[in-house]
């Protein structure tokens, strides 16, 4: 019986996601054993700086990918939104389980909705994507950076001078917080989700055919296609955490991919947005990027990157 070593970050959410995925594999009843190996990433260690200033994509995966390449582990369970657009040679996303709710969750101290928040209220987020879109809708709000896991951020909302914070609905749901704390789910038209938000990425070595066959049982074709379009868009624009960039794709009734893509200025004064429909994930992602580039997306990205230096 083969033992599969599964790499995971040490956070409660990461371990919950990893153990959930292992349970899906165990339920197949095939002759495999599983062991979790906890790995500390750079993003887990640097907590006093905003993600955009630390260096963006790959912060939560590089050490785990090193363990995959050196065969310390056989596969890893990541949040898809943490994944860089390009993976190291020899590694691949071997499985994308069914995506859960991709929306952002708005949590306010007083129970006021986003629209009802008092003028000049303080909004906590560590995401340039969220802050740009929400400032575009409410330029009167003040954005204050907030880092830490879900528990830490909820505690900071309670104890510090934040009036509201934004978290990913998916993480809250996976941790069992959902209805208990969420004031409202922000509609995708108000705040386009991050590329891959709500989805998991199961990363493994390309040459591990045995494991790839096992992972195929859990793969969700709809999630795979839609997330692929989002990631092609992200790659073409070379976007990471340093840039207000968003992309969210769904399947239409006739099986086409509909991708809404967005790039914004840091302060939300400019939001470029396009919706592209097509059947091929790569073509849809590239078309969305090309349309935004024609509108000036590259200049916005350049300005955002300069602003982080």
From Swiss-Prot:
Its EC number is 2.5.1.61. Its cofactor is dipyrromethane. InterPro entries: HemC, Porphobilin_deaminase_cofac_BS, Porphobilin_deaminase_N, Porphobilinogen_deaminase_C, Porphobilinogen_deaminase_C_sf. It catalyses: 4 porphobilinogen + H2O = hydroxymethylbilane + 4 NH4(+). Keywords: Porphyrin biosynthesis, Transferase. GO terms for cellular component: cytoplasm. The modification S-(dipyrrolylmethanemethyl)cysteine is found at residue 241. One of its GO terms (molecular function) is hydroxymethylbilane synthase activity. GO terms for biological process: protoporphyrinogen IX biosynthetic process. Binds 1 dipyrromethane group covalently. Pfam families: Porphobil_deam, Porphobil_deamC. It comes from the Bacteria. It is an enzyme of class 2 (transferase). Pathway: Porphyrin-containing compound metabolism; protoporphyrin-IX biosynthesis; coproporphyrinogen-III from 5-aminolevulinate: step 2/4. Tetrapolymerization of the monopyrrole PBG into the hydroxymethylbilane pre-uroporphyrinogen in several discrete steps. Belongs to the HMBS family. The porphobilinogen subunits are added to the dipyrromethane group. Monomer. This is Porphobilinogen deaminase. It comes from Bacillus cereus (strain ZK / E33L).
């Amino acid at each position: 019986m083969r033992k599969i070593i599964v790499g995971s970050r040490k956070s409660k959410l990461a371990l919950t996601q990893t153990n959930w995925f292992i349970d899906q594999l165990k339920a197949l009843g095939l002759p495999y054993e599983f062991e979790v190996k906890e790995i500390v990433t750079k993003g887990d260690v640097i907590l006093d700086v905003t993600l955009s200033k630390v260096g963006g994509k790959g912060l939560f995966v590089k050490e785990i990918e090193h363990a995959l390449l050196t065969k310390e582990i056989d596969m890893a369970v990541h949040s898809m939104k943490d994944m860089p657009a390009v993976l190291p040679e020899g590694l691949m996303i071997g499985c994308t389980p069914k995506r859960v709710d991709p929306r952002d969750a708005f949590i306010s101290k007083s129970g006021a909705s986003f629209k009802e928040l008092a003028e000049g209220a303080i909004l906590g987020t560590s995401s340039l994507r969220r802050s740009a879109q929400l400032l575009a809708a409410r330029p009167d709000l003040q954005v204050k950076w907030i880092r830490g896991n879900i528990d830490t951020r909820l505690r900071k909302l309670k104890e510090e001078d934040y009036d509201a914070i934004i978290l990913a609905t998916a993480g809250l749901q996976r941790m069992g917080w959902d209805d208990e704390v969420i004031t409202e789910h922000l509609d995708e038209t108000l705040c386009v989700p991050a590329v891959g938000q709500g989805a998991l990425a199961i990363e493994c070595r390309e040459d591990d055919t045995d494991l790839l066959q096992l992972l195929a049982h859990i793969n969700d074709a709809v999630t795979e296609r839609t997330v692929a379009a989002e990631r092609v868009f992200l790659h073409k624009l070379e976007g990471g955490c340093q840039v207000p960039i968003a992309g969210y794709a769904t399947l239409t009734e006739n099986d086409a991919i509909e991708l809404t893509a967005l790039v914004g200025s840091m302060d939300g004064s400019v939001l470029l947005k396009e919706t592209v429909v097509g059947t091929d994930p790569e073509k849809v992602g590239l078309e969305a990027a090309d349309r935004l580039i024609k509108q000036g997306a590259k200049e916005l990205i350049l300005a955002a990157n300069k602003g982080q230096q």
